[in-house]
Amino acid sequence: FIPAYPDWIWHIPAGQITLNQKLYGELLDQAVSIPGATTDRLCQAARDAGVYVSIGVNERNDNASGGSLFNTNVLIDREGNLLGRHQKLVPTVSERMIWAYGDPSTLDVYDTEIGKIGGLICHENYMPLARYSLYGRGIELYTAPTYDQGGTWQSTIRHIGKEGRVYVAGCCMVLRKDDVLSRYPQMEPYYQETGEWINTGNSVIADPEGHIIAGPLSMEEGILYADVNPEHISNTRWNLDVAGHYARPDAFQLKVRTAPTPVITIDRGDSGFVSTDVEDNTFIQKDTVDETESV
């Protein structure tokens, strides 16, 4: 079981401390360690199906306190290898009661046999510099998982497709009011909106010219399919390539930090130090002198 989007953060006031703590504790218990048993199963599923998988999870910060969460997207290749993860850089409004700020070192593009894959999460896609950091690394297949579902969001997906000359998949979950209240009836006072749907989904796929080629898929669970033509990506960059001939690095520069940020730094003088490896959460003895410890 992988918990999805915590919709209740938009309904329950922050002052309802007892209820918020209970729900957060449950979400933390269900959260995913990366790598861990859950990602191992996802990797096995990708290998069995022979597909690339891009999936959102609530990630626990196991390399530090273990008590905080990130809104994270995981990418797995068809051989079952965990290529990487991206943590949402800035939680949106009420999301900050749940998720920590993501580490920018997780902002990356992965070169695969089917193209260069990467993406941003929800309202990160309104961050021009974040988008450009992907364009500048040659992204071709752009994932945009979201909880947004309105007409403006579909226009955003189309804009990204044309701006970056990429294929972009805007995937949004569908959620009925009964999906929440059937399990958490105590939340009914906070869910007084009329209608069956909390989120209608409206997932779409757009091409490098900003045309919607699949979807929108609304008020139902399902799968969108679209054919990807690599030549269409390169051909459309003939007249617009924002990280190529349409760039002006002499006028504008973007600096992206790729080194992970340590939670704490401990100075141990000349005795060497022990640090936490961010990727596998193991402790490594460093034989160094006059160094600092990064955890």
Tell me what each language-model feature is.
Residues 1-16, 22-26, 46, 53-54, ...:
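Active-site beta-strand/loop signature of hydrolases that rely on acidic residues for catalysis
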Residues 7-29, 178-193:
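Charged, glycine/proline-rich intrinsically disordered loops and linkers
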Residues 15, 31-51, 59-141, 145-159, ...:
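Active-site catalytic loop in hydrolytic enzyme cores
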Residues 52-56, 213-214:
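A short linear hydrophobic-aromatic micro-motif
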Residues 173-295:
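C-terminal beta-strand edge segments of enzyme domains
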Residues 3-8, 74, 86-92, 216-220:
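Short beta->alpha transition motifs characteristic of CBS
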